[in-house]
């Protein structure tokens, strides 16, 4: 598989020096992606389709985070108010709990190479309700 095209990233669940997990299009269809080995330089990810109803919940959870991040970037909120701390936003906590099983890498997940292409535009925030400031290109290992 080599789509040749960079595809949209809707949700970033984890990041270190680059994306580690989230939700992105793979072949034009929303999938979870999760780094096969976060300590390796190679960008190999397990990918698996996300059910439409779960996709809606992921986007809702992401929107809560993005709204917090906007306040954080403006200096109006501190890290202690991050919804991921728990007990800050009841709906966020509920969504996180409901989404845990779907975020687990299934035995039939595909292994792909993912390359991130970051947008270099000071006017575009890193995180937006529509997604992230990068796209992914997928290919076979």
Regions found by a protein language model. Give the residues of each.
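Low-complexity intrinsically disordered segments
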Residues: 46-141
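Amphipathic, interaction-prone secondary-structure segments
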Residues: 2-38
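Short linear, low-complexity motifs centered on an aromatic residue
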Residues: 32-52
């Amino acid at each position: 598989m080599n789509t040749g095209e960079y595809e949209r990233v809707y949700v970033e669940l984890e990041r270190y020096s680059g994306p580690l997990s989230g939700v992105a299009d793979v072949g034009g269809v929303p999938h979870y992606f999760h780094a096969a080995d976060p300590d390796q330089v190679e960008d190999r990810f397990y990918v698996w389709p996300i059910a439409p109803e779960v996709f809606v919940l992921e986007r809702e959870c992401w929107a809560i985070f993005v709204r917090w991040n906007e306040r954080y970037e403006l200096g109006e909120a501190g890290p202690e108010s991050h919804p991921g701390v728990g007990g800050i936003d009841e709906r966020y906590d509920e969504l996180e709990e409901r989404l845990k099983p779907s975020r687990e890498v299934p035995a039939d997940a595909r292994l792909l190479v993912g390359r991130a292409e970051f947008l270099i535009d000071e006017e575009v925030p890193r995180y937006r309700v529509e997604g992230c400031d990068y796209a992914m290109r997928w290919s076979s290992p």
